[in-house]
C-alpha cells in the first residue's frame, strides 16, 4: 500500500526531470549550433547576441528602441560587419549600400520575414510582401501613381491643403496666445493628404479639428511603441488575434482608435468599388484627372486575387500610416532648426522672396520650388538628420550569396544597413550632428550623394518619396515665406524633435510634451 502511494509521485518526478533534461539538452545544442555551426558563426559580434534574440528585445522593448545605438557600439568594437542576432547581419560601410539595395534587374531582393511578422496586420500589402516577384507585381501599379508625374497631378490638392493649414489655421492663432502643437498639426496635414488620395473630396477632418486631431497622432505613436514587442515575439500577434475586439477595446482603449482608422480605410474602398461597378469597363482617361489610389488600383492589371477587400484595405492602412508619421517628423525637425537659427531663417526668406511673392494667388509648383536652392539645402539637411527611417532596412538575397570585402554572406541571410550611420559619417559630413544647410550649396562630393539615403534605394525604395518631397517643399516654403505666420517656441527644445528612439520610424524623446509654439 505504501509503495503504491509513492509510485505516482516518483513517476511525476521522473517525468518532470525528463522534460527539464530534454529542454536543457535542446538549449545546449541550440547554443552550440548558433555559436559554432551556424552559417553566421564566422561573423564577428557579441556572443550573447549570436545566441538569443532576447538581447535585441531587451534594448528595443525595455529601453524603447535603443538597439540601433547598441549596434553602433558593436560596429565600433568589431568592425564594419557584425552579427546582431542569431539570424541577421548589420553592415556599416556606405560604399556597400548600392551593392545591397539593388534594382530588380540586378538580382531579386526579398523582405526579411521577421520584419513582416512584426508589423502586425499588414501582410498582403506591398510593403509587407516577402517574395521579390510578388512584391514587384503588387508595387508595379503603384509606381506611376507616386512618380514625379503622378505627384504633379496632385499639386492642386497639395496647394489647397497647405493653404488651409498655414493661412487659414496657423494665421488664425496670431496674437491669441494659444499654445499650438505643430507635431499634431503636421501629422493631421499629412493624414489629410493621404485621405485625399484614397477618396474623392473627403472632409479634411484632421486639419479642421480645433486641436489638429490629437487622437490621430496618438494612434500612430501608441501603435509604434508596440512594434518591438511584436517584432521580438511575433507569435504574440496570433494570440492577440484570438481575443475578441470588445475585450481588446477594454484592455487597450487605443484599439478603438485603430478600428476607427481601419473603418475609414474600408469606407474609402467601398466608395471606389461602387464607382468601379457603375463605371463598368476600364476608363484610362481617369489618369488625366486626379484619381484616388483605389480607383487607380481597381483599373490596373492586377488580377482579382490581388484586389480583394482585405488586401486593398491593408494597402490603404500602410499608405496612410507610412505617409503620415515620417513626413510629419521631418517637418517638425526642419521647422525647429529654422526657428532656432535666425541666420538660416533670414536666408531662407530671401531665397523665397520672389517665388512666393504672389502667394496665395499664385501658388508655385514643386518644380518651381526646386529652383530655390537654399530651400532645397534646408530640406536636404533636415532629411539627413531626421533620417527618414532610422531602423536598419534588412534585405535578403534569396538565390545568390553576397560578397562584402573578405566575407561571403550565404544566400538567404538577412543583411541590414541604416541611414543613421550613413548620414552621420564624419568622413563624409564634417560636424555630422550640426544642422548646416550650407554643406549642400557647394562642393557637394559624390560621397555625400552616395550617403544620402533617407528613402533608401533599390527595388524596395520608399514608394512615397516624391509625395514626401512635394509636401515638405510646399509646407516649408509657405510657412517661412516673407510675410508668413511668425511664431516662437513654447517650452520646446531639440529633444522634442531630435530622433532618439528607433521604433521602426524615428521618434524624439518619449518624455517630450510635443513641438509647441505660440503664433505672434
Curated annotation (Swiss-Prot):
Binding positions (heme): 462
Membrane topology reported for the UniProt record: Multi-pass membrane protein
Localization, UniProt: Membrane
Cellular component per GO, a single term: membrane
Keyword Membrane applies: yes
Pathway: Secondary metabolite biosynthesis; terpenoid biosynthesis
Gene Ontology molecular-function annotations: heme binding; iron ion binding; monooxygenase activity; oxidoreductase activity, acting on paired donors, with incorporation or reduction of molecular oxygen
GO biological process: terpenoid biosynthetic process
InterPro entries in UniProt: Cyt_P450 (IPR001128), Cyt_P450_CS (IPR017972), Cyt_P450_E_grp-IV (IPR002403), Cyt_P450_sf (IPR036396), Cytochrome_P450_monoxygenase (IPR050121)
Key word Transcription regulation present: no
Cofactor: heme
Enzyme Commission (EC) number: 1.-.-.-
Transmembrane segments: 17-37, 229-249, 320-340
Keywords for the protein's UniProt record, in alphabetical order: Heme, Iron, Membrane, Metal-binding, Monooxygenase, Oxidoreductase, Transmembrane, Transmembrane helix
Function: Cytochrome P450 monooxygenase; part of the gene cluster that mediates the biosynthesis of the sesterterpenes ophiobolins, fungal phytotoxins with potential anti-cancer activities. The first step of the pathway is performed by the sesterterpene synthase oblA that possesses both prenyl transferase and terpene cyclase activity, converting isopentenyl diphosphate and dimethylallyl diphosphate into geranylfarnesyl diphosphate (GFPP) and further converting GFPP into ophiobolin F, respectively. Other sesterterpenoids (C(25) terpenoids) are found as minor products of oblA.
Family from the record: Belongs to the cytochrome P450 family.
Protein name: Cytochrome P450 monooxygenase oblB
Organism per entry: Aspergillus clavatus (strain ATCC 1007 / CBS 513.65 / DSM 816 / NCTC 3887 / NRRL 1 / QM 1276 / 107)
Amino acid at each position: 500500500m505504501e509503495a503504491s502511494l509513492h509510485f505516482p509521485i516518483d513517476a511525476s518526478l521522473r517525468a518532470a526531470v525528463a522534460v527539464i533534461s530534454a529542454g536543457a539538452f535542446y538549449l545546449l545544442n541550440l547554443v552550440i549550433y548558433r555559436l559554432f555551426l551556424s552559417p553566421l558563426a564566422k561573423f564577428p559580434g557579441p556572443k550573447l547576441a549570436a545566441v538569443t534574440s532576447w538581447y535585441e528585445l531587451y534594448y528595443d522593448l525595455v529601453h524603447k528602441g535603443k538597439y540601433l545605438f547598441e549596434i553602433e557600439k558593436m560596429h565600433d568594437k568589431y568592425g564594419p560587419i557584425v552579427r546582431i542576432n542569431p539570424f541577421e547581419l548589420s553592415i556599416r560601410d556606405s560604399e556597400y549600400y548600392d551593392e545591397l539595395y539593388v534594382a530588380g534587374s540586378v538580382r531579386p531582393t526579398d523582405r526579411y520575414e521577421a520584419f513582416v511578422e512584426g508589423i502586425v496586420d499588414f501582410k498582403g500589402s506591398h510593403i509587407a510582401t516577402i517574395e521579390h516577384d510578388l512584391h514587384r507585381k503588387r508595387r508595379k501599379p503603384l509606381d506611376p501613381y507616386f512618380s514625379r508625374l503622378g505627384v504633379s497631378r496632385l499639386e492642386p490638392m497639395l496647394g489647397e491643403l497647405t493653404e488651409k493649414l498655414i493661412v487659414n489655421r496657423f494665421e488664425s492663432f496670431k496674437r491669441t496666445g494659444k499654445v499650438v502643437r505643430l507635431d499634431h498639426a503636421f501629422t493631421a496635414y499629412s493624414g489629410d493628404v493621404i485621405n485625399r488620395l484614397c477618396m474623392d473630396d473627403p472632409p479634411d477632418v484632421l486639419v479642421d479639428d480645433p486641436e489638429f486631431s490629437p487622437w490621430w497622432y496618438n494612434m500612430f505613436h501608441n501603435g509604434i511603441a508596440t512594434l518591438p514587442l511584436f517584432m521580438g515575439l511575433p507569435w504574440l500577434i496570433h494570440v492577440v488575434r484570438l481575443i475578441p475586439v470588445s475585450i481588446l477595446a477594454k484592455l487597450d482603449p487605443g484599439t478603438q482608435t485603430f478600428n476607427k482608422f481601419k473603418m475609414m480605410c474600408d469606407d474609402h474602398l467601398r466608395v471606389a468599388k461602387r464607382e468601379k461597378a457603375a463605371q463598368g469597363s476600364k476608363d484610362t482617361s481617369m489618369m488625366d484627372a486626379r484619381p484616388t489610389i483605389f480607383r487607380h488600383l481597381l483599373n490596373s492589371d492586377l488580377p482579382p486575387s490581388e484586389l480583394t477587400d482585405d488586401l486593398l484595405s491593408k494597402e490603404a492602412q500602410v499608405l496612410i500610416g507610412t505617409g503620415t508619421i515620417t513626413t510629419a517628423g521631418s517637418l517638425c525637425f526642419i521647422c525647429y532648426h529654422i526657428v532656432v537659427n535666425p541666420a538660416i531663417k533670414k536666408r531662407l526668406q530671401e531665397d523665397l522672396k520672389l517665388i512666393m511673392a504672389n502667394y496665395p494667388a499664385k501658388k508655385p509648383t514643386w518644380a518651381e520650388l526646386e529652383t530655390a536652392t537654399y530651400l532645397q539645402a534646408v530640406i536636404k539637411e533636415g532629411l539627413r538628420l531626421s533620417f527618414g527611417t532610422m531602423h536598419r532596412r534588412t534585405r535578403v538575397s534569396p538565390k545568390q550569396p553576397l560578397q562584402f570585402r573578405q566575407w561571403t554572406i550565404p544566400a538567404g541571410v538577412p543583411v541590414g544597413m541604416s541611414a543613421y550611420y550613413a548620414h552621420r559619417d564624419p568622413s563624409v559630413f564634417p560636424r555630422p550632428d550640426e544642422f548646416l544647410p550650407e554643406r549642400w550649396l557647394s562642393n557637394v562630393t559624390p560621397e555625400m550623394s552616395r550617403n544620402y539615403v533617407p528613402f533608401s534605394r533599390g527595388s524596395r525604395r520608399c514608394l512615397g518619396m516624391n509625395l514626401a518631397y512635394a509636401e515638405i517643399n510646399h509646407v516649408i516654403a509657405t510657412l517661412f515665406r516673407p510675410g508668413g505666420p511668425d511664431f516662437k517656441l513654447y517650452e520646446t527644445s531639440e529633444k522634442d524633435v531630435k530622433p532618439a528612439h528607433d521604433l521602426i520610424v524615428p521618434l524624439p524623446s518619449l518624455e517630450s510634451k510635443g513641438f509647441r509654439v505660440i503664433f505672434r
